[in-house]
Every structure is written in C-alpha cells, then in structure tokens.
Curated annotation (Swiss-Prot):
Residues reported to bind 2-oxoglutarate: 297
A Pfam family hit: DIOX_N
InterPro entries: DIOX_N, IPNS-like_FE2OG_OXY, IPNS-like_sf, Iron_ascorbate_oxido_reductase, Oxoglu/Fe-dep_dioxygenase_dom
Species whose genome carries this gene: Dictyostelium discoideum (Social amoeba)
Key words of the record: Dioxygenase, Iron, Metal-binding, Oxidoreductase
Protein EC: 1.14.-.-
Group of enzyme by EC: oxidoreductase
PANTHER family: 2-OXOGLUTARATE (2OG) AND FE(II)-DEPENDENT OXYGENASE SUPERFAMILY PROTEIN-RELATED (PTHR47990)
SUPFAM superfamilies registered for this protein in UniProt: Clavaminate synthase-like (SSF51197)
Protein name: Probable iron/ascorbate oxidoreductase DDB_G0283291
Cofactor binding note: Binds 1 Fe(2+) ion per subunit.
C-alpha cells in the first residue's frame, strides 16, 4: 500500500463564530457580520470552520461512541445492513474499499443514511432514488450488539444538523446580498439530506506486509488515500471529524491541512452552489490522508443538498467573475456551469461512479 507525499502549505482555514445574540437588533447585526466572514471564506477557500453552532457536544460524543461500537462489530453482522438491501433508497453499510473516488478505492467503510421517509411518502411511492427508510438495527439487535440508542441518536443528529444547514444557507444568501430565504424558497425548503458515518481504519505498515488494525486486503496496492481528491455535489457540507485528523483542502496556495478543532464543524460549499454563484463561490477539492495514527478515524459528513427534483440555475444580479469555467483545473475536468438538468440527474450520474456495481443493480 502506498501513499503519495506532497508538500503541505502552512495556512489556516477561517473559524467563524455563528452564535447569535438575544434581541433582534443584535441578531441582525451579527448576521451581517457573520455573512461577511462567510463571503470572504467562500471566495478565498470554499471551506471554513464554525463554532457556536448550538449542537450539543454530548449528542456528538454519544454518536461517535456508538458509531465506533458499530464498526467494531463482526463483519458478518455489519453486512446485515449492506446497501444492496435498501435498493433505490441507497442506504446502508459498505465495506472498506467499497467506495470509489475517480475509479480508485477509498480506505474507509461507512454507513449511508438520510432523512427517514416511510413507504407512504410521495417521493417513496414515486420510487425516487435516494429516498426512503434507513437500514437500522432493531431494538433487540441494538441490545444484543451493545449499541442501544444508535437509531435514535442518528436521527436526532440528522434533524439538528439539518436545521443548522437551513440557518447556514440563510447566512450564505445574505453574504450574496440576497434575501435570507433565497435558497429555501427555490431549492432547499425540502432539501435532499445525505448523511454519512465513515470509519477510516488505521494502517500498520511493516516491510512488505500491509495490514489494518482490523482487516487485511488483497488489493491494497491500489489504495493511496482515505478519500481521494474530489468536490462535493450539493450546496453545503457540514462535517464533524474526531481528533485523529487527515482532512486536506486545496487552497489557492496548495494543499493545506484542516485539523480537528474541538467544538467546531468544518463547512464547505459544493458544486451546485458553485454553479449558482457563477463560480464566485468555488466548490473546493479536498481529500483525506491514509490513516496511520494507530487508531480508527471517525467522521460525520452531512450533505445539505438541493431538492432532488429542483433545477439549479445561476443567480442573477450578483458579482460576476471572468472565468467561471474551471474545468481545465478541476479534478474531474467537468464544467459544472454547462450542466443542464435537475439536481437529481447530476447527483445520480456522480454517485453511479462511486458505486458502479450498485448503480447497475438497483437504479
């Protein structure tokens, strides 16, 4: 197993305090100040940390603890919740190396989750991909596997961070001199929420023997990253990462580290916000190093995306840049500003490359 070594620039992503004040005047002033910080961060980095977000640390710690217990279960147990079983809902467990970036295996395992929609929901009845029920252990299984509260904790976390996403999109709208409800009135009143719990097993290298702390692989030589270089697809990603670290962001000056900072989330904009802003706010490439810490790394990205059936278009009347087409320098060489279609069409094309076999079988 090999890992590419590149110089890392010493540079710090902005940390933005989004905590609001009590009365209306103070809150409006704070929103304007925060939005200015977000504008600068989105123009210069496409990434920023937030603190003062209001998500209870006890909830985060509980979910991290339960997630680690889940991933420590025997592989045969985890496979009871494999993604193939969820069919079009595209939910469930995938094995280490089961997810691809640019055709190469990522060194992580994970759970795909999202907003819980019952079988009688109109989008589920219409067999809309990526909508439906999550694959959770039953209460009896939670007791048996010592992960009691796993389902409830996940759904609580999704609900609270989704609400945070709505608040952040208001601030992003204000940062563009738009009405606070610009995105919610057009694209995100009923957002597509894609939530992931990722576990990056630690790698132990000794001579020619390549092993992880938990498993071995027959195809290690093709693995170079925990997650390879990519951009996110939607409008906003809200990421919690544990204290292991490994996230890297491609700034204007080169690759920089985005280390864990207690009490914060890492936020970044995605392809659709890049498209809507005409490239003013760029979706920034990022990646995760192979984990050599000696212990597993956990992260929780929540992708706050436009409604599946919405048609994102460029915002009129905002600041323009000269060269919005950056396809020549993008990791995938795709011009997102030339795309015409629904967000669902864009997303299905992208995720089909992440799980090509699954796409062929269920979509």
């Amino acid at each position: 197993m090999t890992s590419k070594i590149e110089n890392i620039t010493i540079e710090q992503l902005p940390i933005i305090d989004i905590e609001s004040y009590g009365n209306d005047k103070e809150e409006e002033l704070k929103k304007k100040l925060i939005s200015k910080e977000i504008e600068n961060a989105c123009k210069n980095f496409g990434f920023f940390y937030i603190k003062g977000h209001g998500i209870d640390q006890e909830l985060i710690d509980r979910l991290e603890r339960l997630s680690k217990k889940f991933f420590s279960l025997d592989q045969s147990i985890k496979m009871k919740y494999r993604m193939e079983l969820a069919q079009k809902a595209w939910r469930g467990y995938f094995v280490v190396g089961g997810e691809l970036t640019s055709g190469l295996k990522d060194w992580k395992e994970g759970l795909y989750l999202g907003t819980e929609l019952n079988d009688d929901h109109p989008l589920v009845i219409a067999q809309t991909p990526l909508h439906g029920l999550n694959l959770f252990p039953t209460l009896e299984e939670e007791i048996e596997y010592d992960i009691v509260g796993f389902k409830d904790t996940i759904l609580t976390y999704i609900d609270k961070v989704t609400k945070l996403g709505h608040s952040l999109m208001e601030l992003i709208a204000i940062s563009l001199n738009l009405s606070a409800d610009y995105f919610s009135s057009r694209y995100t009143k009923d957002p597509l929420i894609l939530y992931r719990i990722f576990n990056y097993p630690s790698i132990i290298s000794s001579g020619d023997d390549n092993k992880t702390t938990g498993e071995s692989s027959d195809d290690n030589d093709k693995v170079e990253w925990g997650v390879g270089e990519h951009t996110d697809y939607g409008v906003l990603t809200i990421l919690y990462q544990d204290d292991v670290g490994g996230l890297q962001v491609h700034s204007k000056n080169g690759w920089i580290s985005a280390p864990p900072i207690k009490g914060t989330f890492v936020c970044n904009i995605g392809d659709m916000l890049d498209r809507m802003t005409g490239g003013l706010y760029r979706s920034t490439p990022h990646r995760v190093e192979l984990n050599r810490s000696g212990r597993d790394r956990i992260s929780f990205p929540l992708f706050f995306d436009p409604n599946f059936n919405s048609y994102p278009t460029e915002i009129e009347g905002i600041e323009q840049i000269e060269n919005k087409d950056d396809s020549s320098s993008r990791w995938d060489h795709f011009n997102i500003h030339s795309f015409k279609g629904s967000y669902g069409q864009y997303l299905l094309n992208k995720i089909g490359k992440v799980f090509p076999d699954l796409k062929n079988n269920v979509l």
